[in-house]
């Protein structure tokens, strides 16, 4: 299922939240509306953690994570780290990373199997990513942009990349990741798909400005509604067959 939301008038959902198959992080905000969108879809399925990182709310841009682990920058306080450890499942590894490129969400794009990272990340950081997240790591650019986490959104089912990514690059990335990819946008034409969207294997949350066309692309490439925990999204299968009959 794909839903639209706003964080205090901002459509950049991926800046203020992080979503994986085993937990969700949501920034602390003045209004509960944003949190309630996640709560409505994820309550009783995975824990949703109200968090700050280094005293800021841009938690989606400062962290990188998947089902197995969460990476946070060294500026994360001990108190914040303890809060994450208390809220997230026990089998999720949480690790601070000492890295010059500290906005980890901008420079790391990953699912539960593969990570694409900024070409200039430290060698040690690469090893920590492989170890904590349990993924294969590739240094990569997306449409000549080094910020892989900003210009790509990825789940275990599929991915969306910067709209100007060439077909050749899409094919290369797709065979590397072993998932289908599509070049697309969010929030009425924004190329920064990583910042405008969070996704796991059964749910995507994107900005309120995202058009119906963009939303349908998101639902189809991420195969949302085909599978979900405890039957979430089973009703969407009917909608898919109706949509197919139009073409």
Curated annotation (Swiss-Prot):
Post-translational modification summary for this protein: Phosphorylation at Ser-174 and Ser-175 promotes nuclear export.
Residue positions, PTM Phosphoserine: 174-175
Gene Ontology biological process: assembly of large subunit precursor of preribosome; cytosolic ribosome assembly; maturation of 5.8S rRNA; maturation of 5.8S rRNA from tricistronic rRNA transcript (SSU-rRNA, 5.8S rRNA, LSU-rRNA); maturation of LSU-rRNA; maturation of LSU-rRNA from tricistronic rRNA transcript (SSU-rRNA, 5.8S rRNA, LSU-rRNA); ribosomal subunit export from nucleus
Xref: InterPro entries: eIF6 (IPR002769)
CDD domains: IF6
Localisation per UniProt entry: Cytoplasm; Nucleus, Nucleolus
Primary role: Binds to the 60S ribosomal subunit and prevents its association with the 40S ribosomal subunit to form the 80S initiation complex in the cytoplasm. Is also involved in ribosome biogenesis. Associates with pre-60S subunits in the nucleus and is involved in its nuclear export.
Assigned protein family: Belongs to the eIF-6 family.
Subunit structure, as described in the record: Monomer. Associates with the 60S ribosomal subunit.
Name of the protein this chain belongs to: Eukaryotic translation initiation factor 6
Gene name, Swiss-Prot/TrEMBL: tif6
């Amino acid at each position: 299922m794909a839903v639209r939301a706003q964080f205090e008038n901002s459509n950049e959902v991926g800046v203020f939240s992080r979503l994986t198959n085993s937990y969700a992080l949501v920034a602390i905000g003045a209004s509960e509306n944003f949190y309630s969108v996640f709560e409505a879809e994820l309550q009783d399925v995975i824990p949703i953690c109200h968090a700050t990182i280094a005293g800021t709310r841009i938690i989606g841009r400062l962290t990188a994570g998947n089902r197995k682990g969460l990476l946070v920058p060294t500026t994360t306080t001990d108190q914040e780290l303890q809060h994450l450890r208390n809220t997230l499942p026990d089998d999720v590894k949480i690790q601070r990373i000492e890295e010059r490129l500290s906005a980890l969400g901008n420079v790391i794009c990953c699912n539960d199997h593969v990570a694409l990272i900024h070409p200039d990340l430290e060698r040690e950081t690469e090893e920590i990513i492989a170890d904590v997240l349990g993924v294969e790591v590739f240094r990569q650019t997306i449409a000549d942009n080094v910020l892989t986490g900003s210009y790509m959104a990825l789940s275990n089912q599929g991915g969306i990349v910067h709209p100007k990514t060439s077909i050749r690059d899409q094919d290369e990335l797709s065979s590397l990741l072993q998932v289908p990819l599509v070049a697309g946008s969010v929030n009425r034409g924004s190329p920064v798909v990583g910042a405008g969207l969070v996704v796991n294997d059964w749910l995507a949350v994107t900005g309120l400005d995202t058009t119906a066309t963009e939303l349908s692309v998101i639902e189809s490439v991420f195969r949302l509604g085909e599978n979900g925990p405890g039957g979430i999204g089973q009703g969407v299968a009917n909608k898919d067959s109706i949509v197919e009959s139009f073409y």
